[in-house]
Swiss-Prot record:
Species classification: Bacteria, Bacillati, Actinomycetota, Actinomycetes, Mycobacteriales
Compositionally biased region (Polar residues): 384-393, 432-449, 481-491
Any one GO CC term of the record: plasma membrane
Keyword hit for Cytoplasm: no
Pfam families reported in the protein's UniProt record: MS_channel_2nd
Protein name per the record: Uncharacterized protein Cgl1270/cg1434
Membrane topology per record: Single-pass membrane protein
Organism: Corynebacterium glutamicum (strain ATCC 13032 / DSM 20300 / JCM 1318 / BCRC 11384 / CCUG 27702 / LMG 3730 / NBRC 12168 / NCIMB 10025 / NRRL B-2784 / 534)
InterPro entries, sorted: LSM_dom_sf, MscS_beta-dom_sf, MscS_channel_2nd, YbiO_bact
Biased composition (Acidic residues): 313-326
Keywords: Cell membrane, Membrane, Transmembrane, Transmembrane helix
SUPFAM superfamilies: Sm-like ribonucleoproteins (SSF50182)
Biased composition, class Low complexity, residue ranges: 279-291, 394-431, 462-473
Region of interest (Disordered), ranges: 266-332, 384-491
GO molecular function, one term: mechanosensitive monoatomic ion channel activity
Amino acid sequence: MRIIKRRVESAADADTTKNQLAFAGVGVYIAQIVAFFMLAVSAMQAFGFSLAGAAIPATIASAAIGLGAQSIVADFLAGFFILTEKQFGVGDWVRFEGNGIVVEGTVIEITMRATKIRTIAQETVIIPNSTAKVCINNSNNWSRAVVVIPIPMLGSENITDVIARSEAATRRALGQEKIAPEILGELDVHPATEVTPPTVVGMPWMVTMRFLVQVTAGNQWLVERAIRTEIISEFWEEYGSATTTSGTLIDSLHVEHEEPKTSLIDASPQALKEPKPEAAATVASLAASSNDDADNADASVINAGNPEKELDSDVLEQELSSEEPEETAKPDHSLRGFFRTDYYPNRWQKILSFGGRVRMSTSLLLGALLLLSLFKVMTVEPSENWQNSSGWLSPSTATSTAVTTSETSAPVSTPSMTVPTTVEETPTMESNVETQQETSTPATATPQRADTIEPTEEATSQEETTASQTQSPAVEAPTAVQETVAPTSTP
């Protein structure tokens, strides 16, 4: 995981970074599933369960789970295709549509089952991968800023003047310090896409203009806001004024049944003698403000009929640099560190997660693997030549085998000891022949007596020694016979 994160940090391409982050999250997810499966198999083997016997129940259980969890299987398949086809990555601004769901936001995590996004209101939404039928990615490779805005034709000489003024305002917006680094292509102007006649008395004719420019991925909203602001600033007098049927510009609209405006100071003699407290306070505040800033007071007198004209370019720049929800939703690809920074309210959760640095499931997995490894080390069987104790978890079985061997070999030696005594008492040829017959009889009868006894290595060795003892006197007997027969054969 650290190698992947280092590669993500050193990657220069934003798309590569997003894809690597997505694959890293899914890789950890799959590794945990495989590790838990191997842990379960190892535990079953340690407790003596037969995996061959569990194959049939596992097949039946998997079939039942597959029928009951079809949606989960569909989510896993959809997640696999999302990752392999690189439909979107971590940090992309996407919009999901389908099955009655329309939600958009920044992708913060992708797993095999679901995708987590954070909306512009900082709400975390979890969407199963198979639920969203249509996915619209606004941050793939590059984007295009599209501004469609109606422009009044009242203050311009002709349509060419309207097009020139609006295009000049748009180019000023694209040349700003914050906007220029995000521009990738040339400005494309579509003039007079629509003409809107006045619908009520006093409204001017409007011509709709469309401006298009290629920008970096995810920054189209920033460029669009800057273009609209600059166009409004250029046509401020036309937007902020009202017209009459004769075309004369006036400061405010005259609407029928308009309620009379109440003056702050009553001009009656009684009111002049005893002014109201609210009116006096208002007059005092106005006087104080006029004394503090004379220039602002002059500007307010000039624009008294239209207070909206007090907004100048400084106010517009402040609005442009104000809070931008789309930019705040843009993720930060820089990694804050190797360990996690999760917060858990319970004490046992903090202990299992090592203070929020790792997942609790990872801690449990490592603990179980350590416990199984400890039991495996304690149950290691020594070699056959090992003389010391094997441990209480692996008792030795050599003692019981030695006892049974000594008990079974003892009865075999009894009939073999009687064979040499008969051989020593035969001095003649006739007795030698009888002795050979007698000696051959016990040799063949010895295995018959030991039929009820289990054969061992010691019994076999003793039978071989018995046969050798019986054969040695038999060899000497013919020598003695030849010596005794030689004198008798002469006459």
